């Protein structure tokens, strides 16, 4: 990096900003040198639709991010998700920036098609030149079909049905990426021992604690929707032992390992885990399991934080790893967290876990399979090419972040301090900084 000034001011990057109520009734005010460039809050009196679009940073390309459809949507949440997309796309080396959309309602209690049409109509001037949508919580490939038709441009979103040239997220691209991130992390730990890499004592202890057969490594997954269920499937393919999964309704656990293919078949016509038939006791559960049938005991959903496991994968909503749950994970021997969800860990919980030698693979690295697949769809390429590119990019990005974390460690401090999020974030920021400077007309950066 040369002596070109990288400390950009708001006037440097915000000349085209169209901010609508960036400090709302909830007191939210989030503007920094990175963005957001635009915050749109929209309302349609005919349908009652209320929505939010945050275009955070487009220096590397049009803003990319899904449309979340939920009662809990707030401008602050949408901004945080948009910012995560900025780092995610930069880390993955994609020609996209960061953005996110949100519709504020329970999709089961409104006319989802009409509300999606209304939202698309309201933000049409920005699609696809500044914003390219995708699915998220509460939206599916059919919503993307509606969105694209209303915008009048198939390039306005990804995750469309295959009949429209899409690569639906329902194929499991995000979950596959999470499994690749975990596999790469486990391979990295093996390399430490095999290659004799210099590492701190806690990191060596972590390596030794996971030096066992794949089917002896215990994994729990919080969330069993699209991301969580496919993560479980692909981890099962790697012969890892998934001992528990949860959703909003409950927690299914078997210390001997769940039959994931059977569980996915049993869930094919159900909307939540509590719809499964509960067994009376563990003996009955094991008996049915031996007969290739399964009877499930449904525990309280928060019990997932209280069971012994090696690896914890949050694959649902934001903020589930917090000051209350992080100590429970540590108490129950969690050694690695792979963030399948966006922003699942609060900053204070993240610091607490890192300080206590838990290795965290951050969301913008681990769950980038979805947006990588979106990029392949945007280029008009195939499903196979999507999975191949996810494999290639996430393997290399996670490996680079892990090795850079070792090299950045204070050699005088024999503690783990393997803060992958911090190291990977710095890399992403450098990429975005360079793009911002080039947009300003910098000749040498």
Language-model features, listed with the residues they occupy:
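Conserved active-site and cofactor/substrate-binding residues in soluble primary-metabolism enzymes
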Residues: 73-77, 110-114, 118, 138-142, ...
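N-terminal ligand-binding/catalytic initiation module
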Residues: 1-172, 179
């Amino acid at each position: 990096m040369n002596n070109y000034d990288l400390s950009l001011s708001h006037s440097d990057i915000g000349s085209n900003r169209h901010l609508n109520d960036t400090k709302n009734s909830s007191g939210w005010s989030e503007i920094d040198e990175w963005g957001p460039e635009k915050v749109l809050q929209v309302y349609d009196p005919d349908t009652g639709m209320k929505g939010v679009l945050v275009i955070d940073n487009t220096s590397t390309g049009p803003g990319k991010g899904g449309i979340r459809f939920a009662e809990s949507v707030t401008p602050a949440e949408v901004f945080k998700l948009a910012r995560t997309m900025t780092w995610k796309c930069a880390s993955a080396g994609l020609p996209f920036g960061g953005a996110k959309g949100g519709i504020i309602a329970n999709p089961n209690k409104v006319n989802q098609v009409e509300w999606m049409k209304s939202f698309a109509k309201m933000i049409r001037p920005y699609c696809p030149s500044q914003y390219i949508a995708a699915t998220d919580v509460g939206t599916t490939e059919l919503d993307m079909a509606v969105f694209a038709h209303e915008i009048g441009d198939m390039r306005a979103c990804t995750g469309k049905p295959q009949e429209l040239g899409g690569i639906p997220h329902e194929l499991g691209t995000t979950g596959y990426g999470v499994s690749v991130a975990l596999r790469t992390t486990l391979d990295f730990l093996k390399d430490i021992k095999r290659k004799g890499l210099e590492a701190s004592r806690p990191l060596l202890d972590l390596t030794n604690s996971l030096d066992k057969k794949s089917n002896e490594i215990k994994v729990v997954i919080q969330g069993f929707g699209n991301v969580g269920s496919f993560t479980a499937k692909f981890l099962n393919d790697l012969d890892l032992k998934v001992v528990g999964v949860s959703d909003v309704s409950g927690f299914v656990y078997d210390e001997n390992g769940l039959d994931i293919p059977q569980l996915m078949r049993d869930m094919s016509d159900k909307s939540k885990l509590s719809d499964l038939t509960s067994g009376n006791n563990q003996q009955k559960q094991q008996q049915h399991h031996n007969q290739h049938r399964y009877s499930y005991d449904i525990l309280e959903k928060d019990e997932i934080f209280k069971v012994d496991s090696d690896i914890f994968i949050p694959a649902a909503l934001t903020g589930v790893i917090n000051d209350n749950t992080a100590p429970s994970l540590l108490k129950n021997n969690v050694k690695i967290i792979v963030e399948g969800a966006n922003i699942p860990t609060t900053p204070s919980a993240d610091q607490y876990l890192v300080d206590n030698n838990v290795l965290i693979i951050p969301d913008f690295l681990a769950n980038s399979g979805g947006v990588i697949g979106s990029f392949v769809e945007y280029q008009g390429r195939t499903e196979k090419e999507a999975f191949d590119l996810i494999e290639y990019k996430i393997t290399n990005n996670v490996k680079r972040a892990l090795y850079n974390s070792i090299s950045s460690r204070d050699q005088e401090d024999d503690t783990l301090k393997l803060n992958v999020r911090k190291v990977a974030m710095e890399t992403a920021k450098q990429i975005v900084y360079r793009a911002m400077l080039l947009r300003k007309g910098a000749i040498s950066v």
